[in-house]
Structures are given as structure tokens and as C-alpha cells.
Regions:
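Short glycine/serine/threonine-rich phosphate/pyrophosphate-binding segments
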Residues: 18-21, 42-45, 72, 97-103, ...
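Carboxylate- and glycine-rich phosphate/diphosphate-binding segment that chelates Mg2+/Mn2+
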Residues: 146-254, 366, 373
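ATP/NTP phosphate-donor binding region
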Residues: 1-89, 336
């Protein structure tokens, strides 16, 4: 069976990747619209970018009003600021939220209506050139055709997609992630792991995504614990930056499954960081679907630890679940209760969350057929 495989138009990766991108940046126009958040700006990361743009004689306008959960109203404000400033192209720098926002803003400078109008459709068009610079290692947004924005009217996260949302240039330099605090390192690292595992166990998986996925999984299990414990470890940061990109490439081509489908409603309704809500769910979700393909989950276990080579597929799959539990403990992933979520409120909204998850389409991509009741059962298990 034939399959498609898409990547960002151009990727510059490694130490001093920003400085290696000068000619490409100059070719995009005379004035850049920088999309970021206040934390990244305060940490001085945006200044590194603006100093380099100044060296290149590229003017810029900074829009740093993006928060951890970007909304449709933020996108509207960004589009207005872009047009008012007369910019030529867009650079988004930060974690997944600024990067997702940069995609949406660039698209909406040319599209009509509200960003929420495009949920469930394939976004197409010729938009301003888009540059994505991740400062965390995990979301993989720099390699995907997806953007997640909160619809404030309906209080739901919407998934936007389309080849036109892929960046024209992705700049990946581990140095930008060196200042990430432990909590962000854990959340984004677990997000990368979730991407890779879901892509590998997806109905849309293909030989190329399988290769990227297993490589990313191996890197995360080896280097995330190191990066979490020692944020100044350059080797761990560099390997996690690569793992995040690999995992992003995976979901760009074979998509996510029930973990992400169930995670988005938790983030939208209880304001849990995306990577953390994924990590809260991943063990229970995969335990629920593991019998959909013992062979695939066994392959993951054997990539993580060669000692699993002598186990049966079923035994190796179960060992993979144990390894998930271990890495979640190492990264101190909280439970819903520890995060401060009210159980009664959660149960009251459980049916809506399951409905929203099913409507996202992600659960239907799972290697095992999943129903709304299955999702409710998994949500309940998070409290046991």
C-alpha cells in the first residue's frame, strides 16, 4: 500500500542552528512578526533571536501575549498585530503554545472568518513564510501540520490541520532548551514519548514512521531521566531535541491516538499542561489497548531494554507498561488528585470529556477499536 510522508520544507538542526539560518531568513522578507510568550521573553531567549535579526538588518515586531493554552482570541489579536505592523513573515519561538499559535496566526492573515471555523477541515492556502524555533524538547510542533487552539465559546480544544501549516523553516538548537525548568522538561519530554508511542501504535503507521518512532522512544527513555535530573547536561538536551523532532515527524504522518484524544479535554477544562495530562493518561490508556497488538508493544519494550528480547510478546508488552510507570515516577508526574483536580467535578464532566475526545477523531486511530464507554472507563481508572 502506498503512503505519504511529509516533513518541514527545511530544517536546520544542531549547535548554532540559528546562526546558520541567516540567508534563509533574509530571503523571507524585511520584517518579521515574532510570536512568543512572556516567560520566554523574560528569560532572554527572544532577545537572542532579535539580536540576530538586527545583525541581518531584519526589522521585527514582537507579540508575546501567548499563554500556556492559546485561545482563539489570542490568535485574533495576533493576526491584527501582524497586519497593523506590516510584517512579511512569521517567526514563532517558544514551547508548543507559541509554535501552534504562530501557525494559526500565519494562516489567519490570509483566511476569512474565525480560526474555530476551520476545525475538522484541511487548512489550505498560501500564507506568509513561517519559521518555528522550539525552546522545549517535546511538543514536536516544529515538525507537524497540526495546531491546537482553545475555542473559548465552547470551552474545548480544537485540532487544526493541513499541509499548509508545516513550517517553511524549523530551527532546532538544544541550547534554547538548556534553561527549561524541571517541570517543563518532564511535561514536554513525556509529550514526545507519547507522540512516538502513539504514532507507532497507530492505524496509520508505516515503515518510515515506525523507524522514527522507535528511535525517538529509545532516546527518550535513555535521556529524559538525565535531562530531568541535570538540566545542564548538553548531551541529554541535544538528544531530547532530536527525539522531540523525530516524534513530531511521526505524528505528522501517522497521527496520534486515544491518549491525545483524552488529554485535550482535561487540558481545556482543568487547565492541565498538555504534556502532563498525556503522562497522567499514557499508562492506563496503553494498558487498555495493549492486547490490540502485543507484537508492536513488545518491539517497543525490546528497543528500551535488550533484556526483554527473551520474553514473549505478551510478557515484553507488560514490561513496557512497567517501564512507563518507572519513567513517570522518575519525572514526578502527578496524579489528578495531586494536581488539585476535584474528583466530583471531574466525574461531572466525564461524559463531556469522552464525547469531546471521540469527536476529535484521535481515538479512532488507535490500533484497537475504542468506544466512548471505553474512554469513560479509562477516565475512571485515573482515580483508582
Amino acid at each position: 500500500m502506498a503512503y505519504e510522508f511529509s516533513l518541514p520544507n527545511k530544517t536546520i538542526m544542531g549547535e548554532n542552528a540559528l546562526e546558520a539560518s541567516g540567508e534563509t531568513l533574509k530571503s523571507f522578507g524585511e520584517k518579521a512578526f515574532i510570536v512568543s510568550g512572556k516567560v520566554v521573553t523574560k528569560m532572554g531567549t527572544v532577545k537572542i533571536l532579535t539580536d540576530y535579526l538586527t545583525e541581518l538588518d531584519i526589522k521585527f515586531e514582537i507579540f508575546n501575549d501567548i499563554t500556556g493554552e492559546p485561545t482563539d482570541t489570542m490568535i485574533e489579536a495576533g493576526v491584527k498585530a501582524y497586519k497593523d505592523a506590516g510584517c512579511d513573515f512569521c517567526i514563532a519561538i517558544g514551547g508548543g503554545s507559541p509554535l501552534d499559535s504562530g501557525k494559526a496566526i500565519a494562516a489567519m492573515t490570509e483566511l476569512e472568518g474565525n480560526i474555530c471555523d476551520y476545525m475538522g477541515t484541511s487548512i489550505e492556502g498560501k500564507f506568509p513564510k513561517l519559521v518555528l524555533i522550539p525552546t522545549t524538547a517535546g511538543t514536536g510542533s516544529e515538525a507537524t501540520k497540526f495546531s491546537i487552539i482553545t475555542d473559548t465559546k465552547n470551552n474545548v480544544k480544537i485540532l487544526l490541520k493541513g499541509e499548509a501549516l508545516l513550517p517553511d523553516l524549523a530551527i532546532i538548537d538544544y541550547k534554547f532548551s538548556m534553561t527549561s525548568p524541571k517541570s517543563v522538561t518532564a511535561a514536554t519530554g513525556m509529550d514526545a514519548l507519547t507522540h512516538a508511542v502513539e504514532a507507532y501504535a497507530s492505524k496509520k503507521a508505516n515503515p518510515l514512521t515506525d523507524t522514527y518512532a522507535l528511535s525517538a522512544i529509545k532516546r527518550v527513555f535513555k535521556y529524559l531521566p538525565i535531562a530531568y535530573k541535570d538540566g545542564e547536561n548538553k548531551k541529554a538536551r541535544e538528544e531530547m531535541a532530536l527525539a522531540a523532532y523525530e516524534a513530531g515527524v511521526c505524528i505528522n504522518n501517522s497521527s496520534v491516538t486515544l491518549v491525545h484524544g483524552m488529554s485535550r479535554p482535561i487540558g481545556a477544562l482543568f487547565h492541565v499542561a498538555h504534556g502532563i495530562s498525556n503522562a497522567m493518561l499514557i499508562k492506563e490508556c496503553l494498558s487498555y489497548v495493549i492486547d490490540g497488538s502485543y507484537e508492536k508493544f513488545a518491539n517497543i519494550a525490546r528497543v528500551i531494554n535488550e533484556d526483554n528480547d527473551n520474553l514473549s510478546d505478551k510478557e515484553a508488552s507488560e514490561e513496557f507498561i512497567n517501564e512507563l510507570d518507572k519513567i513517570c515516577n522518575i519525572c514526578e508526574i502527578p496524579t489528578l488528585k495531586e494536581y488539585g483536580i476535584n474528583k466530583d467535578e471531574f466525574y461531572k464532566l466525564m461524559d463531556k470529556m469522552a464525547e469531546d475526545a471521540m469527536n476529535s477523531g484521535s481515538p479512532s486511530n488507535t490500533i484497537k477499536n475504542i468506544s466512548k464507554q471505553d474512554l469513560i472507563n479509562i477516565y475512571e481508572k485515573l482515580w483508582k
